Amino acid sequence: MKFYYLDGHLPVRILGEELDSFIIEKSNKTLEFVEKNRVSEEPASFGNQLGFIKLPKSFEPKFGEDYFRASEDLTKAIKVTYNDSKYERLRVSFGLCFQTEVEALAYLAALEFAERFKPTN
């Protein structure tokens, strides 16, 4: 299965091609027409991989620095100021901190795709 990256980070699947646009499927199953120049084969930054999906490079914030991560319920990206707590250090060590909101959203989209396409036994 091949994934492409919308706006440099968000994983999508290409379902069709028009003259100047692609028909893409997002992780939430919505279809959209987007200009071809917004879709790339590789993400703008690459850190880890989740199945076939390349995740953005994680960010290691310093004390008092802002970063983005997934909310506790994994429904949205939230902006957080790094406070050096035990939980924040765990997030950093597991690569769950991102410099931009779109990178955090890309991580959430990757989780959503992985859940949809996980192998069934």
Task: Pin down the residues of each PLM region.
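Structural boundary micro-motifs
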Residues: M1-N121
